Structures are given as structure tokens and as C-alpha cells.
């Protein structure tokens, strides 16, 4: 029957850990790097007795009620067992003692230290000491000869020595080990051991085998090895009978041999692959205890038979029952008789083979009482004879074993995937319960410490910001083990005791009334396992697989079932995150699930029990939210993961804490995560997983790094930076979706940073001739950045790339228009707006503006032909257009206020034609295929009309604010501006236009900057890309953003261009270098229209029909 491996449990903090049994095997004694010696009644002992012996305990030995320890203060101390009372110091060294062992009688101990010395000390009289000198490096391990004649030692100098105790001389030395300068750097601690009783063999672990040296001759008759051993062996130990030898490797493998037959009897692998550093065989039972370098304790049951004989035990009653059930109703069959009659005669190895094979041939052979002469057969009479010989004494043991036929090794036994022990529930940012001084929680609000001494049991609460609440001291009368903290309350919980129910205790310090605490008892047989706080609510998960919700004032709310036992919980605002066991994990992996709920007015479940990703063979160590409300968690391998709401609520690794640790045994204890600024707040723990309460630990800040490939290259770095920025600004979309306030500048800065990175990656791909990759990068850009990419491709002479990018820009524009139309269909407010008294054109009525303008043009012609001119300057000739059926147009759009003449061609020339031609010019024949939607064109027309109205209407100038004055610098030059210059040159112009003319001229005389010229050049492009912009200030802001994206050379060229420009419009027109001939023709037509308009003003004596004919002619142009 193969050995049974029990689930390991936490024993000590990370570091070298040793284990031994007492003389009777009633106690398991362990010591570790936390300086404690613990006495376990068995592996399931939840409350082992603990004795602190120093800062670190390197080794321990137990014999005759004396417990000897080697500790970090360079001493070897003795304690009474099991009381743990100090009984003096046996010896001292100048450095740490690395190993200490008892002799067989228990009256002497041997200790080896890093100062190269080995000492043998009498336990009763420590003045009786012997010192052995000869090693040239720290001593690794020691072992007493059972007859107290020899002492074996291993050292970092690479030698194994055997000393004669009586004269303190070296009998023999073997240079078989790898040299090192210190114990911590040694590849193996080489825990050697003498064979019990006679001490005929000395076992030494060397590389991947165990060398056995014969006593006194010091020869090496044979080595023990196995094909399953792939790493260096660390330690060996003998069974009490001396027949079996167990060895542990640095990769967690435990192997057991039969020394006489050299057969490998057992192969057991550590569940997590940690190095085995402690092995101890039970004095009487077939049990081995072992420890690893992580401080864990494990047990192997049913290892081998310790009688020193080949097993001849009967088949167990359980196996008999199983076979009887199999042949139920056929008790008199030959198979049943065979099992009852011959069970005694079947050896263990034959039994294993029979049980292992399910073929019918084996059953037939067994029924015939004929095992045959195969290679695994054993004659029963010979076996009985050999067993009788073995009972004669220990000296005949080897001879009787050799008389047995040679048995070949059994084939490896595979147990299948091993289930992983379930992780126990825990509170995030808390330290283990067994510590007398521990943190119950450390978060962004404050700290809760728990002190559980023999004299005092109390809880201290400290707030980082004392304006929230002052520090609080509480008596821990109910033995609270769980605690959490928020800006509103302190929440504590305890498990049930003998007669006390499990309690939930809340101190609501933010309450405005005088009652500031409440308490709730759980039902019988229901214990609280995890708690958390949110905004206005508290939650508790219990052993009954229930989650109970409470208001912060103590009102019970919803109660719902959990799909499995809870592991941990966290709350933030209205969000509640629960991690629980979905099932049983295998091969060291945990099987966890996660639920994310929103507990606001509209309750919602975001994650429906999805599997929680963990690193292989790891467990959950921290669960919480970032300060901005994004769920995060950390596993035992140091991987920090964050919920990516932008990718279907998946989990993305954002940091590996282990990369920041300097030492192998160092860790970081996470206390909080921030997305803005991007900080991982944690406490460094030197040589342990948890920080001490005193002195107060300092918080360190780690940076985030996504695990992208080739981050040493420029491409990999920019890719990591881009997705890093995208991931860590997803919370802004979540805040906006849920109606929270946030700074718009943060999002704008993030978008700008992302677009700059995309442009850099596109430029890099362009240089590397990766044009297809350029298009892929452009697909991630915004509409404005795509236009910049098109310009870059054109200047780089990548014409095919520019064409592909143009097609992509057209697709993006079509998608944007489609999205806008869908939004308009879903939220159509036109009927609601038109039902009221206001007929102001809004963004919801934009598609109707074009038809309204066309209707107004038709009415203009009708009015100008039918009605005679009236010289009443206050009369509006478009009054018929403002009927109840048609909404009014923007004031000042199509009439002159100085003479009262109707200007029928203003809408056509100034609104429609320049808008189309300007856009066609800016695209430089690249975006010719893009069609403008009616919404964009009408928005542009409305914007240009708004810009012209201050010039056309003769209003008295008012004092301007600084913002308005600055905005006037960036006004686009329009035909109306040219008109005012003509009025200035003509002294016969009407005096009513003088204020506007003076104001416009004073603004035009100011020196222009490069940005102003660039904005005039690209104004139409900005308006076409952003149809929703209606304010001049917004146009300037958008222009400034685009101007900053330009390279330094381009900005400098615009500045030089502005310095060399003259004030005249003719020179300005020449410097702009218009390319398209259609624009020139349009400008000529505009000049002709202006001359005709001036002519109509001068000839006031002309009759009305002539003016009407002139107006009709100009309209047709």
C-alpha cells in the first residue's frame, strides 16, 4: 500500500525549518526562522504549544525530556520538555550554530557552527566539552555513531569527516560535496545519518544519490539512487529498525529505499515543490514528518513496515469487506475461501501486485493456489523459514534478508491528480491569528491592531487622517478576530465560543445621533468568516454559506446564498466583491470563483461567479478595490491583477511584486492600490511574509508594469505604455457611466498621451516599412489623429499608406455619423422642443435647418419682386418668413441693417460655397471621397453666420472681456471683413457702420502669430471633424491641441511665416499659395458680388425694377 500524504499546514514563517519526535512519538516538535519552537500533538492540532527561544532557531533536538536549540544569538540552549522552561546554556560559538544532535543515550549533544568548529558537550555538566578542529568552512550537519565511538560531520569546505570522539582525531575524510562559502549558499545542507542499532553504515546525501560507507573499513559498497530523482538530495534519515532509508530533495521529492534490497519503496512529491529541509521518522509507527523551506509541516502515513522484516500482515478487514461485497451471495465460492484461507500467506509486495492487476488471469491463479514461477513469486515455506531466522537477532538480519529471492522493483504507482486543501477564509491586509500582536486590518483609512497577551487583550484603532476620527482603544472581551475600517464605521466580528454566539459589532462613529454602536448575534451553529464595509452598508459571510447585508445603522437587509465557502470579501462605495471556493482544486491549484455586485438603488450583478485566475500552485493573499473603485487582488506568487472593464470584465496582470524583492525570502505586504496617481502601496517584509506591529513599519510604493513582450525594445516599451494608460484610465468611463464627478482634464491628458504614443509607434513602423502595421495602429486612433497620420504618410511619400489611411478615415467618419443618427433616433427631443414657445434652432433640430434656409431663399425672391422698397429702416422684409408654421432663422444672417436692402445672395456665397470649398482644399485631394453629413454642413453654416453677425449689424461697441478680446484674434476672415475694409477706404460710406469698422480695423492691425495663421488655415477642418463645436473658444482650444501635436520644425515654419507676412490682404492671399483652381474662381465671384453691392448702394436714385434685376443676376451667380 503506497504512503498516504496528508495536506501540509503552516508551521513557521518562511525559512529553514526542522522537525523531530519525542521519545514516545506523542509530540511533533518543530522550530523555524520566526524563533519559535512549536509542540504539536498531531498534524491537526490547531493550537500547538509555542515557546520563543530567540530571534531565529536554526536547529533543535529532543531526548529524555530535554529540548536543545541552536539559535541566532550564537548559543546552544536547553529547555525542559514539554513545559518549555529554560534550563541553561550548554555552549557558545562566535557565530551561529547550524546543527545540534543528541547521542543515543541522550547524555551528550554535538553542535557545529559557522566558525568551523564542532563541539561535544555533556548535557548534565556543560563544563565537559570537546572541540573538534579541522574543517575549513562552516559546518553543515552532524551525526553520532550509535555506539558513541565516532562522530560524522559535513562542511561547506566540501568534505565529510569522521571523528574519533575519544582522542578528537579525524579518522577519515571524503571530498564529495560541492564547496561553498556559507550555509545559505550551500546547494545542500547534507544532513547525514548513521544506521541505528549497530551503526554499520553511514548514509551521506551527495548530489542525486545517497552514498553508504561501511563502518571502520570506510569503504563505499554501494549507492542508493532512483530515476525519479532530478535534483540534489538535501537530507537523509533512517527508520528505527535500520532497514529503510528516506531522503528528501530540494525539489520536494521524498524517496524511501529498502537498504538491503536497494529497492525504491516510496516516491512522494511535495504538493508545491518546495525544498525538503527536515525529516523525522516516528519511533514506532510507519510515519514520517517533514518540513520545507517555506515553514510548512507535512506527514506521510503508512510509509513502510518498521519491524525490519518483509511485511506479513493480514489483509485488512476493510479490504476483506470490499471483497466480500464484491462476491456477495457466494460465500462458499473458491475465491472467498482463498481470501479467507491464504490472506496470511501473501506478502506485502505480492499483495500489492495482485491488487494492482485486475486481469482475470490473476484471479484464476489465486483460486488455484498456484502463484507460479514468475519473477515476482515467493515460496511461502521459504518465506516462513526466513522469517524464523530473522527473529534470532539483529546480527542475523542481513543474512536472512539475503536468503530471500531477488525481487525486482515494482512499476511506479500513479495515484492520479491529488486534491488541493482548501484555502481558509481571511481578511485582506491582516496578519495570522496565532500572533499575539497582529494587524486586523491596514487600509487607506487607518490601522486596527490586536494585542492578545496573558495580561491584556485589547484593540487599538488608528486613523491616518485624524479629522475623520480620533484614535480609539477597545477592550477585546469577545475575542474579536476579524476587523475592517471605513470613513463611516469600525466593524468587528468573532467566532462562536462555548456558550457565546458569533457576533458582529459595529462602531458607527459617523452617526449624528448619540447611539454610535450596535451588535448582532448570529444564529446557532453559524459563524462569521469574513466581513467588509461599503458606503452605507456592511456585509458578513458565514459558515452557513449565507451573506448577510446590513445598513450602517444596523438594519438587516438582504440575505442570499453563496455558491461555496467564502475565502475573502471587499467593499468600496456601492460595490461588493466576494471570492469563494467553486470546487476542489488539484495539483496545488485553488478553484476559486468571484462575484461582483452593485448595491445601489439599481442593484446589479456584474460578475456572476466567474473563475478567479491565479498563478499555478498559488493562493489568494489580498482582495480589495483601488481608491478609484476598480477590483484588484494579489496571489501568493506576487501577481497583482486588476479588473479590465474595457475588455468584458476580464482580469489583467499589472504588477509582479516578486520582481521588486531583493532577497528570496523577502515579500511585500499589500495595503492599497491607487490608479491616479498609479501607486501600489505595500510594506516590505525582510525574511517574512508579514510585518511586525512594532516598530511601526514604513509603507513603500511600487510601480505598475504590464507583462508585455520585448519591453527592452522601443516598440515593446511604447506598446506597454499605451495599454498601461488605457487600462489605468478605464475607471473614468465607469465614473461617468455611474454619474460620479471627475476631472475632465485627466481624461483629456490621458487621450493626448495615448494618441502621442500611437503616432510614435506609427512613425516607427513607417520607418521599418511596416505599412500594414501602420493601418492597424491608425485603427486605434481618434479621427483627428488619423488625419495627422495621413499628413505624415503623405510627407513620407507613402502614397499607398496615405490612401489606406484615407479609407480608414472615411470609415471612421461613416461610423461616427451612423452612431450619431442612432443616438438621435433613440433620444429624439424635436417634438418636445417644437411643442413649446421657443423656436430656437437646437442640435436636435439641425437636420431641418437646411430645408428652412432653402425655403427662406425662395421667399426672398418672392418678397423682392412683389413688394416695393420701403425706406423704414426698422421694418424686416423677412417678416413673412417668421410665420407660425416656420421657425425663424438666426438674426443677422441675410440682411443689411444700414440701408435696409435685402441681400439675397449672402446665404449662398458666404454659407454654402466657402464651407465646401474650404474643406476640399484642406484635404489636399486625399479625403475627396469623404461625404459630409447634413448635420456637419448645417453646423458649419450656423457657425459662420454667428461669426459674421457682429460685423454686419451696426451695434454700439461694448467693453470687452479679456477672453472675448483673445478670441477675436482667432476670428476667421470672411467676405464681410473685406467689406468693412472697402467701407473704410470710401469716405462716403454711411456713418452708421463706423463703430464696427473701427473695431474690426483695430483688431486686424494687431500682429499675427504662427498659431493664428495655422488656425485660419485649418479652421474648416476642425469644424468638419467636430460638428458639435459651436463656441469660438472651443475652436481655439481644439486648435491649440492640434497645433501642439505638430513637430517643432512645423511650428517654427508657421512662426516665421507670420513674421514675414504684410498687413495687406493681397499679400496674404499670395503667401497662402492656393492650389485648387475652384477656390480662385469662387474668390473672383465674391469680388464681383461686392462691387455690385457697392454700386447698388451708391445709385440710390435708381428705380426698384433695376435693383431687382441686379439682385436676381447676382443670386444666379
Swiss-Prot record:
Keywords of this entry? Acetylation, DNA-binding, Isopeptide bond, Nucleus, Phosphoprotein, Repeat, Ubl conjugation, WD repeat
Assembly, in brief, is: Trimer. Interacts with the polymerase alpha catalytic subunit POLA1. Interacts with MCM10. Interacts with DNA2. Interacts with CDC45 and GINS2 subunit of GINS complex; these interactions associate WDHD1 with the CMG helicase complex.
**Name used for this protein in its record:** WD repeat and HMG-box DNA-binding protein 1
Q: Where in the cell is it found?
A: Nucleus, Nucleoplasm
Protein's gene: Wdhd1
Q: Where is this cross-link: Glycyl lysine isopeptide (Lys-Gly) (interchain with G-Cter in SUMO1)?
A: 1116
**Chain residue ranges for the region called Disordered:** 816-885, 911-1005, 1054-1074
Looking up Pfam families in the UniProt record yields: Ctf4_C (PF20946), HMG_WDHD1 (PF24815), Mcl1_mid (PF12341), WD40_WDHD1_1st (PF24817)
Q: Write out the function statement from the record.
A: Core replisome component that acts as a replication initiation factor. Binds directly to the CMG complex and functions as a hub to recruit additional proteins to the replication fork.
Molecular function GO labels: chromatin binding; DNA binding; RNA binding; RNA polymerase binding
- For bias type Polar residues, the affected ranges are 873-885, 917-943, 962-974, 988-1004
Query: Source species, please?
Result: Mus musculus
A Gene Ontology annotation in the biological process aspect, one of them, is: regulation of chromosome organization
Give the sites modified to Phosphothreonine.
819
Instruction: Spell out the residue ranges that the record assigns to WD repeats.
Output: 11-50, 52-91, 93-131, 134-173, 184-223, 228-267, 271-310
A cellular component term, taken from the record's GO annotations: chromosome, centromeric region
Amino acid at each position: 500500500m503506497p504512503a498516504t500524504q496528508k495536506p501540509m499546514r503552516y508551521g513557521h514563517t518562511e525559512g529553514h525549518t526542522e522537525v523531530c519526535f519525542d521519545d514516545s512519538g506523542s509530540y511533533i516538535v518543530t522550530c523555524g526562522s520566526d524563533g519559535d519552537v512549536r509542540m504539536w500533538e498531531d498534524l491537526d492540532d490547531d493550537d500547538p504549544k509555542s515557546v520563543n527561544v530567540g530571534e531565529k532557531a536554526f536547529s533543535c533536538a529532543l531526548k529524555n525530556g530535554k529540548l536543545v536549540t541552536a539559535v541566532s544569538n550564537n548559543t546552544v540552549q536547553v529547555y525542559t520538555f514539554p513545559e518549555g522552561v529554560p534550563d541553561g546554556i550548554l555552549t557558545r560559538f562566535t557565530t551561529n550554530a547550524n546543527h545540534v544532535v543528541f547521542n543515543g543515550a541522550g547524555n551528550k549533544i554535538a553542535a557545529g557552527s559557522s566558525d568551523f568548529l564542532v563541539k561535544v558537550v555533556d548535557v548534565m555538566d556543560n563544563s565537559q566539552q570537546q572541540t573538534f578542529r579541522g574543517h575549513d568552512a562552516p559546518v553543515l550537519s552532524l551525526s553520532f555513531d550509535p555506539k558513541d565511538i565516532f562522530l560524522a560531520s559535513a562542511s561547506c569546505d566540501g568534505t565529510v569527516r569522521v571523528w574519533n570522539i575519544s582522542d578528537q582525531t579525524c579518522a577519515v575524510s571524503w571530498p564529495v560535496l560541492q564547496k561553498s562559502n556559507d550555509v545559505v549558499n550551500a546547494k545542500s545542507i547534507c544532513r547525514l545519518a548513521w544506521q541505528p542499532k549497530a551503526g554499520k553504515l553511514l548514509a551521506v546525501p551527495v548530489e542525486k544519490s545517497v552514498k553508504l560507507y561501511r563502518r571502520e573499513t570506510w569503504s563505499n559498497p554501494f549507492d542508493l539512487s532512483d530515476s525519479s530523482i532530478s535534483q540534489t538530495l538535501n537530507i537523509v534519515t533512517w527508520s528505527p529498525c535500520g532497514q529503510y532509508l528516506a531522503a528528501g530533495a530540494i525539489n520536494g521529492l521524498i524517496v524511501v529505499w529498502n537498504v538491503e534490497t536497494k529497492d525504491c519503496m516510496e516516491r512522494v512529491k511535495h504538493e508545491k515543490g518546495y525544498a525538503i529541509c527536515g525529516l523525522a521518522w516516528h519511533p514506532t509507527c510507519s510515519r514520517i514528518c517533514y518540513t520545507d523551506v517555506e515553514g510548512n509541516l507535512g506527514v506521510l502515513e503508512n510509509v513502510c513496515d518498521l519491524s525490519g522484516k518483509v511485511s506479513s500482515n493480514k489483509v485488512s478487514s476493510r479490504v476483506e469487506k470490499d471483497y466480500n461485497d464484491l462476491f456477495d451471495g457466494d460465500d462458499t465460492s473458491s475465491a472467498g475461501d482463498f481470501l479467507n484461507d491464504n490472506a496470511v500467506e501473501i506478502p506485502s509486495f505480492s499483495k500489492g501486485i495482485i491488487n494492482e492487476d485486475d486481469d482475470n488471469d490473476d484471479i484464476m491463479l489465486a483460486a488455484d493456489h498456484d502463484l507460479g514461477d514468475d519473477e515476482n513469486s515467493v515460496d511461502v515455506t521459504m518465506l516462513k523459514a526466513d522469517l524464523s531466522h530473522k527473529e534470532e537477532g539483529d546480527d542475523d538480519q542481513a543474512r536472512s534478508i539475503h536468503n530471500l529471492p531477488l525481487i525486482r522493483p515494482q512499476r511506479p504507482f500513479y495515484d492520479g491528480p491529488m486534491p488541493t486543501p482548501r484555502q481558509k477564509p481571511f481578511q485582506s491586509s491582516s496578519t495570522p491569528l496565532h500572533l499575539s500582536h497582529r494587524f486586523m486590518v491596514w487600509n487607506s483609512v487607518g490601522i486596527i491592531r490586536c494585542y492578545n497577551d496573558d495580561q491584556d487583550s485589547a484593540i487599538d484603532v488608528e486613523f491616518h487622517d485624524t479629522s475623520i476620527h480620533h484614535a480609539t482603544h477597545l477592550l477585546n472581551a469577545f475575542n474579536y478576530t476579524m476587523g475592517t475600517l471605513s470613513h463611516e464605521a469600525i466593524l468587528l466580528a468573532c467566532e462562536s465560543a462555548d456558550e457565546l454566539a458569533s457576533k458582529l459589532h459595529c462602531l458607527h462613529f459617523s452617526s449624528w445621533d448619540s447611539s454610535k454602536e450596535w451588535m448582532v448575534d448570529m444564529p446557532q451553529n453559524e459563524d462569521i468568516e469574513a466581513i467588509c464595509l461599503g458606503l452605507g452598508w456592511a456585509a458578513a459571510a458565514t459558515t452557513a454559506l449565507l451573506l448577510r447585508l446590513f445598513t450602517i445603522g444596523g438594519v438587516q437587509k438582504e440575505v442570499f446564498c453563496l455558491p461555496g465557502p467564502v475565502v475573502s470579501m471587499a467593499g468600496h462605495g456601492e460595490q461588493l466583491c466576494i471570492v469563494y471556493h467553486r470546487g476542489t482544486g488539484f495539483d496545488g491549484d485553488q478553484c476559486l470563483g468571484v462575484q461582483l455586485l452593485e448595491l445601489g438603488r439599481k442593484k446589479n450583478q456584474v460578475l456572476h461567479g466567474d473563475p478567479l485566475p491565479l498563478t499555478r500552485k498559488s493562493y489568494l493573499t489580498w482582495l480589495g478595490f483601488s481608491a478609484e473603485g476598480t477590483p484588484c487582488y494579489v496571489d501568493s506568487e506576487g501577481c497583482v491583477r486588476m479588473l479590465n472593464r474595457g475588455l468584458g470584465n476580464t482580469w489583467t496582470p499589472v504588477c509582479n511584486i516578486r520582481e521588486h524583492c531583493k532577497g528570496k525570502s523577502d515579500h511585500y505586504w499589500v495595503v492599497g492600490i491607487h490608479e491616479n496617481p498609479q501607486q501600489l502601496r505595500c510594506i516590505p517584509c525582510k525574511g517574512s511574509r508579514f510585518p511586525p506591529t512594532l516598530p511601526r513599519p514604513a509603507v513603500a510604493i511600487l510601480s505598475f508594469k504590464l507583462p508585455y513582450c520585448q519591453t527592452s525594445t522601443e516598440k515593446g516599451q511604447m506598446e506597454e505604455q499605451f495599454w498601461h494608460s488605457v487600462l489605468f484610465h478605464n475607471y473614468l468611463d465607469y465614473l461617468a457611466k455611474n454619474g460620479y464627478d471627475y476631472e475632465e482634464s485627466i481624461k483629456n491628458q490621458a487621450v493626448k498621451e495615448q494618441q502621442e504614443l500611437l503616432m510614435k509607434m506609427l512613425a516607427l513602423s513607417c520607418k521599418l516599412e511596416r505599412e500594414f502595421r501602420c493601418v492597424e495602429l491608425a485603427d486605434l486612433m481618434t479621427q483627428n489623429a488619423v488625419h495627422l497620420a495621413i499628413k505624415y504618410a503623405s510627407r513620407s511619400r507613402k502614397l499607398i499608406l496615405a490612401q489606406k489611411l484615407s479609407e480608414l478615415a472615411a470609415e471612421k467618419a461613416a461610423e461616427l455619423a451612423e452612431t450619431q443618427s442612432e443616438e438621435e433616433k433613440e433620444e429624439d427631443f424635436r417634438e418636445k422642443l417644437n411643442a413649446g414657445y421657443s423656436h430656437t434652432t437646437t442640435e436636435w433640430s439641425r437636420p431641418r435647418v437646411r430645408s428652412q434656409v432653402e425655403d427662406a431663399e425662395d421667399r426672398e425672391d418672392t418678397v423682392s419682386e412683389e413688394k416695393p422698397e420701403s425706406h423704414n429702416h426698422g421694418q424686416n422684409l423677412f417678416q413673412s418668413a417668421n410665420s407660425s408654421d416656420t421657425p425663424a432663422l438666426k438674426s443677422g444672417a441675410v440682411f443689411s441693417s444700414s440701408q435696409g436692402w435685402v441681400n439675397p445672395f449672402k446665404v449662398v456665397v458666404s454659407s454654402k460655397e466657402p464651407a465646401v470649398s474650404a474643406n476640399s482644399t484642406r484635404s489636399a485631394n486625399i479625403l475627396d471621397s469623404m461625404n459630409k453629413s447634413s448635420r456637419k454642413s448645417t453646423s458649419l453654416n450656423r457657425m459662420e453666420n454667428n461669426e459674421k453677425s457682429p460685423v454686419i449689424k451696426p451695434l454700439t461697441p461694448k467693453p470687452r472681456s479679456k477672453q472675448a478680446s483673445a478670441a477675436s484674434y482667432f476670428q476667421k476672415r470672411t467676405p464681410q471683413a473685406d467689406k468693412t475694409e472697402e467701407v473704410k477706404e470710401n469716405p462716403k460710406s454711411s456713418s452708421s457702420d463706423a463703430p464696427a469698422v473701427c473695431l474690426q480695423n483695430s483688431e486686424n492691425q494687431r500682429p499675427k502669430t504662427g498659431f493664428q495663421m495655422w488656425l485660419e488655415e485649418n479652421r474648416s477642418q476642425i469644424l468638419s471633424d467636430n460638428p458639435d463645436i459651436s463656441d469660438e473658444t472651443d475652436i481655439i482650444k481644439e486648435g491649440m491641441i492640434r497645433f501642439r501635436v505638430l513637430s517643432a520644425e512645423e511650428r517654427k515654419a508657421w512662426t516665421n511665416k507670420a513674421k514675414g507676412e504684410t498687413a495687406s490682404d493681397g499679400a496674404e492671399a499670395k503667401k497662402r499659395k492656393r492650389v485648387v483652381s475652384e477656390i480662385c474662381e469662387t474668390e473672383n465671384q465674391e469680388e464681383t458680388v461686392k462691387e455690385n453691392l457697392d454700386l447698388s448702394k451708391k445709385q440710390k436714385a435708381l428705380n426698384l425694377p433695376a435693383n431687382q434685376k441686379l439682385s436676381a443676376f447676382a443670386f444666379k451667380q
